[in-house]
From Swiss-Prot:
NCBIfam families: PRK05339.1. Belongs to the pyruvate, phosphate/water dikinase regulatory protein family. PSRP subfamily. Its EC number is 2.7.11.33, 2.7.4.28. One of its GO terms (molecular function) is protein serine/threonine kinase activity. Bifunctional serine/threonine kinase and phosphorylase involved in the regulation of the phosphoenolpyruvate synthase (PEPS) by catalyzing its phosphorylation/dephosphorylation. This is Putative phosphoenolpyruvate synthase regulatory protein.
């Protein structure tokens, strides 16, 4: 039976999940996780406490409880459960109060709930990424913070969306396809925005595997075609002096982090 993990918050529980995943990923075992957001009342907290206690009785093991709860009265109820508590907010707030010389002013939903200008900027970035995905249009490319280039299925779309959702970066992306390979060059609209261009590449064998799952035994997915496209695109990157990274076996988070590090684009945290 897998060890039970609870992610609990009086907000979205995103913070508890992120911290909890980061910690648990250090251990080579699997866990069974349950996320419970918006625990905003004592009644709800007592329901969650009962779930934790029932889990302990059923499994004989204390559940791991990662939480980011602002209200002390709700937090105390979770503390009184049979779970092993990992309280991220309280762990860091008290030492910071000492260092800063001021008391914290806890507000529920402050981390991920602000409907302010920063939030609007993130929504604009997400809309931009979707409207300018896969070379749908180059009319608004001058408004991009970043333009990702690459062959089909190398990770352009997920990287663009992640950068927009996580960091508020307006990221367009443009594909190079089979028909481009005989005379591969940048469209004029991209040449005019060359400082914004960033390339993605991928191991041809891995690209072949990905394309096979999409269009099995087609010319598009053949290993030969994958090798041709990757080779031609990488040659163009070098010719045009476009920075690029290899996405093979890297998560979208890792790809985005490499892009930010290499481009120097400013992160906007929300």
């Amino acid at each position: 039976m897998l060890r039970k993990v609870f992610y609990i918050s009086d907000g979205t529980a995103i913070t508890a999940e992120v911290f909890g995943h980061a910690v648990l990923s250090q251990f080579p075992v699997e866990f069974e996780a349950l996320t419970i957001p918006f625990v905003e009342t004592e009644s709800k907290a007592n329901e969650v406490k009962a779930q934790i206690n029932d889990c302990f009785i059923t499994t004989g093991e204390r559940p791991l409880v990662f939480h980011s709860i602002v209200k002390a009265e709700i937090r105390d109820i979770i503390y009184s459960s049979e779970g092993l508590d990992y309280d991220f907010l309280n762990t860091f707030v008290a030492p910071l109060e000492q260092q800063l010389g001021i008391s914290a002013t806890p507000v529920v939903h402050r981390t991920h709930g602000n409907m302010n200008e920063s939030y609007e900027a993130r929504i604009d970035a997400i809309n931009y990424a979707m409207d300018n995905d896969d070379g749908q249009t180059l009319k608004h490319i001058d408004k991009a913070d970043l333009v990702l280039l690459g062959v089909s299925r190398c990770g352009k779309t997920p990287s663009s969306l992640y950068l927009s959702m996580q960091f508020g970066i307006k990221a367009a992306n443009y594909p190079f396809v089979e028909d481009d390979m005989d005379n591969l060059k940048l469209p004029d609209a991209l040449k005019k925005n060359k400082s914004k261009l960033f390339g993605l590449t991928i191991d041809p064998v891995r690209l072949h595997e990905i394309r096979q799952s999409r269009m099995e035994n087609s010319r598009y997915s053949s290993l030969r075609q994958c090798r041709i496209e990757v080779k031609e695109v990488e040659m163009m990157y070098k010719r045009e002096r476009i920075p690029f990274v290899n996405t093979t076996n890297h998560s979208v988070e890792e790809i985005a982090t490499k892009i930010l590090a290499m481009t120097g684009l400013e992160r906007h945290m929300f």
